């Protein structure tokens, strides 16, 4: 990847330069990141340790937890370190690495959410063929395809962004290396890079289309059910996934459909906090609080660890 940049490091300006907010932000980011590690790590352990959870739905959920750890870890540790030390510098290579892993894991999440929607469609709309549709091979293929597509997309984004020259200011008006502030910082012609980023962004719309089509057929199937109890049961199995989908895609759409302005930059930062650190923390809570199987598996683990209680 050819690069003629004179910049060797960037300065991440962060969420705010108000010194009175640095400690509260540090504590908030640290707390959320620790909960993210505990929640997603715990979810993977629970699913791995209970044979009853070795199903396609929980296979994708364990991968989702891994991905949430990945893209949260691409951003949160550096942000916490900068808030703690006051050192806002990040090397050129460090910025490129953060950018690559964040975009990669975020795109993988899109594909995993689409795979989970397809799994729910197969379970609700074709229950008699579910075991032959969602085989171990199909699940592995969908998961592998998600990771390959995600990091291929990240490679295209990184190539389109870091081939540019950064020969002026090195101050990124953000708390991590994201696409819009980096393109705004470049002193090169960014039209081709913006086009590449736009085309590569088709991943988000493709996965959203798969999700919408899957849930369209799920809704039709629910409407055809004569039993209110059956409708309630089907809806409850999809409720957690729908909640996670709404939060994730709602935040992305809100961010990238805003007009460019000084106010939208600050709004983008707040939205970025939500989808970089808050959503990875919320996902294990969303999928476990209303899930009897996960809660049952958790109690089994706790009973083994602390039988006296």
From Swiss-Prot:
**Disulphide bonds in the chain:** 95-177
Q: Which residues cross the membrane?
A: 27-47, 56-76, 96-116, 138-158, 200-220, 236-256, 271-291
Task: Report if keyword Acetylation is assigned.
Answer: no
Q: GO CC: one term? A: plasma membrane
Q: Which Gene3D superfamilies match?
A: Rhodopsin 7-helix transmembrane proteins
Q: What residue ranges lie in the Extracellular compartment?
A: 1-26, 77-95, 159-199, 257-270
Bilayer disposition of the protein = Multi-pass membrane protein
Q: Tell me the residue ranges located in the Cytoplasmic compartment per UniProt.
A: 48-55, 117-137, 221-235, 292-309
Q: Does the keyword Ribonucleoprotein apply?
A: no
> GO molecular function, one example?
odorant binding
Concerning Pfam families, the annotation shows: 7tm_4
Q: Where in the cell is it found?
A: Cell membrane
Q: Which UniProt keywords apply?
A: Cell membrane, Disulfide bond, G-protein coupled receptor, Glycoprotein, Membrane, Olfaction, Receptor, Sensory transduction, Transducer, Transmembrane, Transmembrane helix
Q: What does this protein do?
A: Odorant receptor.
- Can you tell me which family this protein belongs to? Belongs to the G-protein coupled receptor 1 family.
Q: What is this protein called?
A: Olfactory receptor 5B21
Gene transcribed to yield this protein:
OR5B21
């Amino acid at each position: 990847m050819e690069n003629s940049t004179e910049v060797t490091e960037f300065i991440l300006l962060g969420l705010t330069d108000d010194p009175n907010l640095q400690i509260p932000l540090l504590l908030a980011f640290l707390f959320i990141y620790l909960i993210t590690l505990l929640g997603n790590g715990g979810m993977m352990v629970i699913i791995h340790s209970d044979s009853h959870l070795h199903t396609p739905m929980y296979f994708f959920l364990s991968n989702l937890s891994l991905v949430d750890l990945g893209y949260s870890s691409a951003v949160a540790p550096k942000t916490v370190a900068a808030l703690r030390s006051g050192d806002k510098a990040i090397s050129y290579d460090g910025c490129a690495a953060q950018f690559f892993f964040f975009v990669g894991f975020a795109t993988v999440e899109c594909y995993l959410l689409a795979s989970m929607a397809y799994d729910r469609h197969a379970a609700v709309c074709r229950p008699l063929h579910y075991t032959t549709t969602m085989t171990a091979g199909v699940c592995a293929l969908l998961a592998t395809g998600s990771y390959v597509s995600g990091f291929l997309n990240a490679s295209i984004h990184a190539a389109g962004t870091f081939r540019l020259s950064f020969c002026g200011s090195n101050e990124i008006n953000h708390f991590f290396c994201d696409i819009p502030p980096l393109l705004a910082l470049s002193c090169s012609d960014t039209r081709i890079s913006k086009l590449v980023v736009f085309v590569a962004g088709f991943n988000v719309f493709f996965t959203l289309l798969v999700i919408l089509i899957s849930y369209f057929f799920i809704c039709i199937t629910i409407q055809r059910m004569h039993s209110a109890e059956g409708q309630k049961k089907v809806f409850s199995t999809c409720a957690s996934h729908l909640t996670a989908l709404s939060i994730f895609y709602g935040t992305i759409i809100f961010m990238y459909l805003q007009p460019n302005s000084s106010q939208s930059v600050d709004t983008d930062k707040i939205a970025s906090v939500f989808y970089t650190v808050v959503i990875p923390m919320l996902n294990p809570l969303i999928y476990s609080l209303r899930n009897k199987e996960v809660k049952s598996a958790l109690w089994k683990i706790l009973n083994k660890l602390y039988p006296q209680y």
